Amino acid sequence: MSHAYPPDRNKSIAWAKHVLITRNRWVILDTETTGIGPRDEVIQIAVIDLKGTVRLDSYIQPIRRKKIPLAATAVHGITINMLQGASSYLELFPRLEKSVADRTIIAYNAEFDKQLLDQTARINQAQQLEASWACAMLQYARFVGEWLAFKQDYQWQKLPFAGHNALADCQAILDLIQKMAKTPMWRPK
C-alpha cells in the first residue's frame, strides 16, 4: 500500500532520527493493566532508556481488584497470583519517578498509559507522575500512512512484535523507532 501523503512519512522518520540522536532526553514506558475502564489499574510497568537499558520493570499489586479479569489475562497473561508480594503503586512511585526524571516519556498509545497511571495514582492516593509525553503510536500511524477520510487522520496501527509484557513492549517500541529512523526519506521525482 502506498502512503497517502509521503511528506508526512518523512516527519515521522525525522522524529525517530531526532529521538535517537537526543537519546538521553527520552525514556520508553509501557504498562499492563487490569482493563481499560475507570476502575482499572496498572499492574505491570517497565521503563527503558534509548540504549535499551532497563530503568524499571515491576509488577504492581492492585488495590481495587482481587482478581484480574479473564479478558485482561488473555491479553497479557498476568494473574493475581503473579502479583503476590508485588509493591503497591504508592511504594513503587519513587522508583518510577526516578526512572523518568528529566526525560520525555515515549509510549505506544501514550494517552492510554498516562490515563491509567493517573487513575492508578488516584486509586492509591498517590502523587501523579509529572512528565512530558510523546506518542510512538501516532508517529507510526503517520509513518504507515493509511488515511481514514472519515476521521481525517491516519489509521492507528498495532505495535509490531508486541509481547503484551511491559518490558517486551518497551523493547518493541525502541525497535520500531530504530526501524523508522533507518527508513530512507521520500523525495519528489
Which residues does each PLM region occupy?
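Conserved non-catalytic scaffold segment of RNase H-like nuclease domains
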Residues: 2-130, 145, 152-160, 164
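Conserved beta-strand -> loop -> alpha-helix junction used to position metal-binding or nucleic-acid-contacting
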Residues: 127-141
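Short leucine-rich amphipathic alpha-helical surface patches
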Residues: 140-147, 181
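Acidic, divalent-metal-coordinating active-site segment for phosphoryl/phosphodiester hydrolysis
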Residues: 165-179
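The feature marks non-catalytic terminal segments
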Residues: 178-189
